[in-house]
From Swiss-Prot:
GO CC terms: cytoplasm
Protein name per its UniProtKB record: Pyrroline-5-carboxylate reductase 1
Keywords: Amino-acid biosynthesis, Cytoplasm, NADP, Oxidoreductase, Proline biosynthesis
Keyword rRNA processing part of the UniProt annotation: no
PROSITE patterns: P5CR
Listed EC numbers: 1.5.1.2
GO biological process: L-proline biosynthetic process
Upper classification of the organism: Bacteria, Bacillati, Bacillota, Bacilli, Bacillales
Pathway where it operates: Amino-acid biosynthesis; L-proline biosynthesis; L-proline from L-glutamate 5-semialdehyde: step 1/1
Organism: Bacillus spizizenii (strain ATCC 23059 / NRRL B-14472 / W23) (Bacillus subtilis subsp. spizizenii)
Length: 297
């Protein structure tokens, strides 16, 4: 996978940009949390809307200090960035209602699973700049691995704006749109794999006499340390693994048990199955979008 990563230090100034989230689910909340934590956009410049759940909007407004309002109360035309975060099944109707209000200069960020930039471009017309986005749940604490795929009409300046905004939530990787499924398998679903691993680390430590919370803390710090070693040393994972694996030592015994139990293959299969399911979801959406069949992949 060829990627381009832009670090936080390279991000441009936002200069009072206004951002609107169309959709107020868990994905939108994770992104809102990450952006608010980064403190690069004034809270009053961030708003969120949905079709009818005013209680949810009030909850987000209270929690994050942003503006929650119905679609009719938000001046869509004044926004610089619109983030499409509704459910994919609602995308066609939402885009239909938005297309008369969206302005040609506005940047559209889509976190709609399975829906391509082409679908949105053809739905909105006007050669709208669209960026497809795949964050993960760690966006909530500013530690997401987020992929972006650029539509046909995204200028260099708008790409920088997208990277800057999403960089508030963690690291940003620019990939080809046909790589989104495998990215989803690795990064979109990836946090769950590590939480699953942590369940067993915690349980095993507790069974051996450690306090449950202590076992969790030890395991989490170990995962964090290993991740930092990979990112800061630049070494290959097998090199770092070999460096701490002495012949007939404790690590060798543990790795042997992992291999015997199919640990490595299990990880590979988890990623492949998640990527396959991502593709299946995309295909299902294509079948239901008969008027624009062929533009969702």
């Amino acid at each position: 996978m060829r990627t381009k990563k832009r670090t936080k230090e390279m991000l441009p100034i936002f200069d009072q940009k206004k951002v609107a989230f169309i959709g107020a689910g868990s994905m939108a909340e994770g992104m809102i949390s990450g952006i608010v934590r980064a403190n690069k956009i004034p809270k009053q410049n961030i708003c969120v809307t949905n079709r009818s759940n005013t209680e949810r909007l009030a909850e987000l407004e209270l929690q994050y200090g942003i503006k929650g309002a119905s679609p009719n109360q938000i001046c869509i035309e004044d926004m610089d960035v619109l983030i499409l975060a509704m459910k994919p099944k609602d995308a066609e109707s939402a885009l239909s209602s938005l297309k008369t209000r969206i302005q040609p200069h506005q940047l559209i960020l889509s976190v709609l699973a399975g829906i391509t930039t082409s679908f949105i471009e053809q739905s909105l017309l006007n050669q709208q700049p669209v960026v497809r986005v795949m964050p993960n749940t760690s966006s909530m604490i500013g530690a997401s691995a987020t992929a972006i795929a650029l539509g046909k009409y995204v200028s260099e300046d708008l790409q920088k704006l997208a990277e800057a905004l999403l960089g508030c939530m963690g690291e940003v990787y620019t990939i080809q749109e046909n790589q989104m499924d495998i990215f989803t398998g690795i990064a979109g679903s990836g946090p769950a794999y590590f939480y699953y691993l942590m369940e067993f680390i915690e349980k095993t430590g507790e069974e051996a006499g450690l306090d449950k919370q202590l076992s969790r803390s030890i395991g989490a710090q170990t995962l964090l340390g290993a991740a930092k070693m990979l990112m800061e040393t630049g070494e290959q994972p097998e090199v770092l693994r070999d460096n701490i694996t002495s012949p007939n030592g404790t690590t060798a015994a543990g790795l042997q048990a992992l291999k015997k139990s199919g640990g490595g293959e299990a990880i590979s299969q988890a990623i492949k199955h998640a990527a396959k399911r991502s593709k299946e979801i995309s295909d299902d959406i294509e079948k239901t979008a008969a008027p624009l069949s062929g533009v969702i992949k």
